[in-house]
Amino acid sequence: MVASSTSNVNNATAINADSTDGATRRLSFAKIHEPLDVPNLLALQTDSFDWLVGNERWQARVAKAVEEGDLSVATSSGLSDIFEEISPIEDFQGTMSLSFSDPEFADPKYTMAECKDRDATYSAPLYVKAEFMNNNTGEIKQQTVFMGDFPLMTEKGTFVVNGTERVVVSQLVRSPGAYFERTADKTSDKDIFTAKIIPSRGAWFELEIDKRDQVGVRLDRKRKQSVTVLLKALGWTEGQILEEFGQYDSMRATLEKDATETREDALLDIYRKLRPGEPPTVEAAQSLLDNLYFNSKRYDLAKVGRYKINRKLGIDRSLGDKEASVLHVEDIVAMIKFLVALHAGEKTLTGKRDGQDHELRVEIDDIDHFGNRRIRAVGELIENQVRTGLSRMERVVRERMTTQDVEAITPQTLINIRPVVAAIKEFFGTSQLSQFMDQNNPLSGLTHKRRLSALGPGGLSRDRAGMEVRDVHPSHYGRMCPIETPEGPNIGLIGSLASYGRINPFGFIETPYRLVSEGVVSDEVQYLTADDEAEVLIAQANAPLDENKKFAEETVLVRARGGGGEPVLVPAADVEFMDVSPRQMVSVATALIPFLEHDDANRALMGANMQRQAVPLVRSEAPFVGTGMERAAAVDAGDVVIAKKAGVVTEVSAELVIMLNDDGTETNYRINKFARSNQGNCYNHRVLVSEGQRLEVGGIIADGPATDQGELALGKNLLVAFMSWEGHNFEDAIILSQRIVAEDVLSSIHIEEHEIDARDTKLGAEEITRDIPNVSEEVLAGLDERGIIHIGAEVEAGDILVGKVTPKGETELTPEERLLRAIFGEKSREVRDTSLKVPHGESGTVIGVRVFDRDNDDELPPGVNQLVRVYVAAKRKITDGDKLAGRHGNKGVISKILPIEDMPFLADGTPVDIVLNPLGVPGRMNVGQVLETHLGWVAKTGWKIEGEPEWVKQLPNLPRESGSTTVATPVFDGAREEEITGLLDSTNVTRDGDRLINSSGKTRLFDGRSGEPFPDPISVGYMYILKLHHLVDDKIHARSTGPYSMITQQPLGGKAQFGGQRFGEMEVWALEAYGAAYTLQELLTIKSDDIHGRVKVYEAIVKGENIPEPGVPESFKVLIKEMQSLCLNVEVLSTDGTTIEMRDSDDAVFTAAEELGIDLSRAEPSSVEEV
């Protein structure tokens, strides 16, 4: 057993509890040595963006790769690639050209914190060298041109756009390249073979062998034609065709049917099929063909497409070659050859790879294989947007070249940067892949940045995605987590990068393996893509090794090609690679589930997803039973403040820590206090260091939300008992102890932001003021002289936060009034109260106020003079109706909170905290929660092992005795059942000398109400419980009178609209079944949309009279109008046959009001806010 903070790499000893990096001492049950630490978990985002902008970090990486002789790394940044690609822009005659080079960034205008505060975008100005050349005179003009503000990525892998943090999700798309497929023909028993080349952009090239064995080609998705016609058009003669393809019957048959003789005939034939109705000429046909596949402006395979075609077809064309991105005749010939060989049933072909002859496997492709799907990460997604913007700009430049005077032209006059800026803005603001960051807790942010989505532009759509795309594929191993994916319509389309996965320069996901030679496993690590992996034999990480790192057994289980994803046994000497770690196949969130190997996959999926919904609590507590992944997750999520350089702390305050580094420099670390996250949670940092303390690089300065001593801490360790209690925990309901409420164990702080602006209206400017008409002084008591609530005020629903008045329309004045007005000056204008009030169901304490004013030179949207933001924080204690969950997909709702004295208690008098239903375990098959409970008890009570039992020999590093501690049981390499039972038998005894729980994991519990023992022993232990972001306070809702829908006049629905509850079809059936006619009539009329009736009823209730007869519902009138619009004349008749006049709803209100004597001139609330 190894003890370490993050992984079991250092096989030495446990990190000291008093070590400077604040890591808690975790005792690990891992038995497998791992040669590789978990990599930086945000590299997926940061590396990609570094490549795009070509910053110093990226340059350092390139220099290192070149030094190591790795040639696959791109040596030019993404932006410089695009500018090089678009240059030169020439006018239509080719007399002038404009080219761009050397993009570089100036310093950002605001820091990230200022951007969040001001609702600005965190960006830096981009400048490019532009060179205009007049080819006639040879004159050159150079200028540095501003190309707009370019959003920058923060250190945490996010973007700040308009003041909110956003994440750009990586996209999983089909890779450009050559693909071969076989489909059964519907009309005959033959198979149809198809091949296609998919470019990064440009026309598709498709080949097909039909049931008559004719080889056809389809250019640019148009009509099919004979492939020999194409070959002749490309300059081949019949003799050459026969020489190359003579041995294949299908090609000979196709050639016999081909009527064209010469190259010209073939070109004209192709032109007629592609452009029917246009007069064909040889020149037009030639240029059409060239533009389709051989012109780099129109067609681009991208490096990855060229790489895939080279590998598939055995072509040896350099990737750096200028012409590599377009098709060549040899590509088309190799493509045809591969397809006819596949059709003829051949198994191999000879091709070239890396300059050597290579046997190519002739087989069809699996679209869902990760060798054929690649990742478009942030850098590439933004690059594509900039490319779109620049190509729009290119058109403008061309037009301006022709219209402007040649002498006066400078690069600046030609360029219009609007399309570029617009394209970037559009991407960050509206793209499906640029998402509002999930900041529920550090793990949810980390997972969001590591998400892989098959949706989005150029990807799949939910409705069209079949089962195959969503399914787990053997090639996902170590690349995409088979467990973490959403439930619902997106299942399988959105995944999460596996913990050790990384992305190579072509966009394929690689995963690391240890090299094995002749049965000896080395610590040297090599990264393989899914394609490379298909060729080799790979052993699992848990294959037993002896002390010389040799396989302990003769035969080893490996994953091999042709095994159909099933493992096979091979001799140890044949194994070539071995997994680096047992948790290699799962994502970070899944790797945080202890005893994952004992949980059913469906429940593990829920467990991984629910950890992301855990709310940060007032006090975080690390789990007794972890997996050793907690530290890496918390640190890489970026919500913990860590030391960038080694040094000594010189100054500490709540908001700032200053360190004097060993190299003589000083670093300031800002500490967040009670900030609001995107999800309205409280993101607060707590300083852990003291003045004079020394820290090494990576040492922890402050804990963030849901972290404890630098470890992820999403919930609380609670004492659970698995038993039923009076049926109150039926169907996953949970019983909780009052102690949890009283001691704020599961309390969390939530911060809401309320904002109001004062604008210019047609009738005059709105004003933020304390002087509000018809409002009593006690209502205004909390407001200061500006009319804004003061910090620290306790507010309830309906209280005024910011006083604001809006001018009302003035009525036409009589001549007398005008005269008086002229003599005595202006009477006070009519205004109405439009103050910002606390919404329904919310309350709390005001913790912050921000005022932005045009007069103080704050940037505000047009028409806005002032903007006020008020932050209200509320402490939410746990209450019945809140949702709790464990880490194994075991979730439930609190049904009852019992007084401490009524809770079942242990023999030493300790009451349990939470009672769960034991029936929640067997059917769900998540036994991991039971093992966690037992091991949690062991970790909390500590142990003392006597003698040398068999199970201890597996764990040489386990301390023989220990007090209360935390343990790690890594995924697929954790504590075994016999180890847990052994430790349960060795737990420390109480002061009475009793061991409360023995190896069965069960104990006698006593009923808190009677003090009697329960008849059977009950499982008791510590489980880690999370409070999820589904709080009953956010869901509970009641309506008195509120807004109505415009057309039907029925109450709106939903909490957001302050709506009513829908009395639906089934509820109506229930009333019909009881014959409750009057209740039903009320629901259809006066309680809903009988306008006249509801006004009358209101009055009757106020005056204490009987309820009047209901009238005609408004929706019935709408129905009649709809039928009239279909030209059906509908009349409503009374019982005596006379026609009833349907008055319009507007009239009905006024008539009703008149009859009732109600004054309707008072302002009625028109919106939810005003209610």
From Swiss-Prot:
Catalytic activity: RNA(n) + a ribonucleoside 5'-triphosphate = RNA(n+1) + diphosphate
Superkingdom assignment: Bacteria
Claim: Lipid metabolism is one of the keywords in the record: no
Any one GO biological process: DNA-templated transcription
Keyword Nucleotide-binding in record: no
Molecular function terms from GO: DNA binding; DNA-directed RNA polymerase activity; ribonucleoside binding
CDD domains xrefs: RNA_pol_B_RPB2
Pfam family, one: RNA_pol_Rpb2_45
EC number(s) recorded for this UniProt protein: 2.7.7.6
Keywords on record: DNA-directed RNA polymerase, Nucleotidyltransferase, Transcription, Transferase
Top EC class, one word: transferase
GO cellular component: DNA-directed RNA polymerase complex
InterPro entries: DNA-dir_RNA_pol_bsu_ext_1_sf (IPR042107), DNA-dir_RNA_pol_bsu_external_1 (IPR019462), DNA-dir_RNA_pol_su2 (IPR015712), DNA-dir_RNAP_su2_dom (IPR007120), DNA-dir_RNAP_su2_hyb_sf (IPR037033), RNA_pol_bsu_bac (IPR010243), RNA_pol_bsu_CS (IPR007121), RNA_pol_bsu_protrusion (IPR007644)
PANTHER family membership: DNA-DIRECTED RNA POLYMERASE I SUBUNIT 2
Record text on subunit structure and interactions: The RNAP catalytic core consists of 2 alpha, 1 beta, 1 beta' and 1 omega subunit. When a sigma factor is associated with the core the holoenzyme is formed, which can initiate transcription.
Family listed: Belongs to the RNA polymerase beta chain family.
Role description: DNA-dependent RNA polymerase catalyzes the transcription of DNA into RNA using the four ribonucleoside triphosphates as substrates.
Protein name per UniProt: DNA-directed RNA polymerase subunit beta
Organism: Arthrobacter sp. (strain FB24)
Encoding gene, per UniProt annotation: rpoB
